[in-house]
């Protein structure tokens, strides 16, 4: 889910912090990519329905290969542009996310029921819509994706918990320049730069959104702690929303009161019932100090492609077109041997003014309510990071 409504809010409140870029703008950059999000996008992009029958990309044996096709093609496209992708995979979800995951399971089950109704009615459009809501990336697809990337010589990192948090850790410590994901909570985890729409195909001509956290804070007058509180009020994966608090009210609340505690005390208890499981203190702590492997412990290396391994895996096992795979290997080797010109901005140090924090104000008079935001204890142990198809018919 990420952060509900944050993208629109930032376009309204800090438009200058967001730039529209082409893929080639990131030449020479290391980008930490949320792998699971990318794979999910590749799978749903290749699902469709016609005459009541589902269509998805498979090989001649009927194996779904959407994830491998999309990952191979898009990674090659980035490498062609001189980009150095680093793929980060999700680990164990935090305890705080349990309710959100259960909600997703319930929504997927409901989508399955709606799919069957649409199938009986012969409604291709509704079938496609509901089918995409049931998509889940399988463990097998994750492992196949890791294998493909490693054979291509692209770094793979296994996060101990949330991939966005691990990506943000790499960016904050200078191991990567930006996080590539659709989930806005990459900013909430502290990534200084975030890229959205990185996996959109060139044919759709949708620009990549480059968002700078320091400029967001400077334009809004928020400190990082206040920005995190705003994101929690907007709606995140770790706590339920407070009823009746939309984006504008959340924005005004943090601007006026400076933190969730003071804002909650200002609310009319009769109009805004704070959920008992609104564990905002734990959510805040997780955003500011997530479970990640320290960037200093991660050795990121780009290596030569394993030509024989790629042919064995893609051509012999997954039945990819040999010419396509060989051309891909040639592109990988060309990227390694090509003399890369350094980015001009690498020769300069840019110093920006620190953002100004908004000072908390006294609560409004009126009916008050105290909510300490404490619900559960979050703990975890850090883990070392490690570094010719056709459409099939679903009946």
Swiss-Prot record:
Annotated residues for binding of Mg(2+) 2: 183, 185, 237
Keyword Phosphoprotein carried by entry: yes
Cellular compartments annotated: Nucleus, Nucleolus; Nucleus, Nucleoplasm; Mitochondrion
EC number: 3.1.-.-
Binding positions for DNA per the UniProt entry: 74, 162, 235, 237
Domain of life, per lineage: Eukaryota
Enzymatic class: hydrolase
UniProt-annotated binding residues for Mg(2+) 1: 34, 90, 162, 164
Entry GO terms, CC: mitochondrion; nucleolus; nucleoplasm
GO terms for biological process, alphabetical: base-excision repair; DNA replication, removal of RNA primer
Cofactor binding note of this UniProt entry: Binds 2 magnesium ions per subunit. They probably participate in the reaction catalyzed by the enzyme. May bind an additional third magnesium ion after substrate binding.
This protein's UniProt keywords: DNA damage, DNA repair, DNA replication, Endonuclease, Exonuclease, Hydrolase, Magnesium, Metal-binding, Mitochondrion, Nuclease, Nucleus, Phosphoprotein
Main subcellular location: nucleus
Region (Interaction with PCNA), start-end ranges: 340-348
Post-translational modification: Phosphorylated. Phosphorylation upon DNA damage induces relocalization to the nuclear plasma.
Cofactor(s) demanded: Mg(2+)
InterPro entries according to UniProt: 5-3_exonuclease_C_sf, Flap_endonuc, HhH2, PIN-like_dom_sf, XPG-I_dom, XPG/Rad2, XPG_CS, XPG_DNA_repair_N
Entry-linked CDD domains: H3TH_FEN1-Euk, PIN_FEN1
A Gene Ontology molecular function term of the record: DNA binding
Signal sequence bounds: none
Xref: HAMAP family: Fen
Subunit structure and binding partners: Interacts with PCNA. Three molecules of FEN1 bind to one PCNA trimer with each molecule binding to one PCNA monomer. PCNA stimulates the nuclease activity without altering cleavage specificity.
Similarity-based family: Belongs to the XPG/RAD2 endonuclease family. FEN1 subfamily.
The name this protein goes by in its record: Flap endonuclease 1
Organism: Leishmania braziliensis
Lineage of origin: Eukaryota, Discoba, Euglenozoa, Kinetoplastea, Metakinetoplastina
């Amino acid at each position: 889910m990420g952060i509900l409504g944050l993208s629109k809010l930032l376009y309204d409140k800090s438009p200058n912090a967001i730039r529209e870029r082409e893929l080639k703008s990131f030449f020479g950059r290391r980008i930490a990519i949320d792998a699971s999000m990318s794979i999910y996008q590749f799978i749903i992009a290749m699902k469709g329905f016609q005459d009541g029958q589902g269509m998805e990309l498979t090989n001649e044996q009927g194996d779904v290969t959407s994830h491998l096709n999309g990952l191979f093609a898009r990674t090659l496209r980035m490498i062609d542009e001189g980009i150095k992708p680093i793929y980060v995979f999700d680990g164990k979800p935090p305890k705080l996310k349990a309710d959100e995951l259960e909600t997703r399971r319930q929504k997927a089950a409901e989508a399955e029921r709606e799919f069957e109704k649409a199938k009986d009615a012969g409604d291709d459009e509704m079938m496609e819509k509901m089918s995409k809501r049931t998509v889940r990336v399988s463990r097998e697809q994750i492992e196949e994706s890791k294998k493909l990337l490693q054979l291509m010589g692209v770094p793979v990192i296994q996060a101990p918990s949330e991939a966005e948090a691990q990506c943000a850790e790499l960016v904050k410590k200078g191991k990567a320049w930006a996080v590539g994901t659709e989930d806005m909570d990459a900013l909430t985890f502290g990534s200084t730069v975030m890229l959205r729409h990185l996996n959109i195909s060139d044919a759709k001509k949708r620009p990549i959104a480059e968002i700078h956290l320091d400029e967001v804070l400077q334009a809004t007058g928020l400190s990082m702690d206040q920005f995190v509180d705003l994101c929690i009020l907007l709606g995140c994966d770790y706590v339920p929303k407070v009823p009746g608090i939309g984006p504008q009210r959340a924005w005004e609340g943090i601007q006026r009161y400076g933190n969730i505690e003071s804002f909650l005390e200002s609310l009319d208890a009769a109009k805004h019932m704070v959920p008992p499981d609104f564990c905002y203190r734990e959510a805040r702590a997780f955003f500011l100090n997530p479970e990640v492997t320290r960037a200093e412990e991660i050795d990121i290396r780009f290596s030569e492609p394993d030509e024989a391994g790629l042919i064995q895996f893609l051509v012999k096992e997954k039945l990819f077109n040999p010419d396509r795979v060989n051309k891909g290997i040639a592109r990988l080797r060309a990227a390694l041997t090509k003399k890369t010109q350094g980015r001009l901005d690498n020769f300069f140090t840019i110093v920006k003014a620190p953002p100004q924090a908004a000072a908390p104000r006294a609560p409004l008079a009126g009916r008050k309510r105290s909510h300490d935001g404490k619900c559960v204890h979050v703990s975890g142990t850090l883990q070392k990071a490690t570094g010719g198809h056709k459409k099939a018919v679903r009946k």
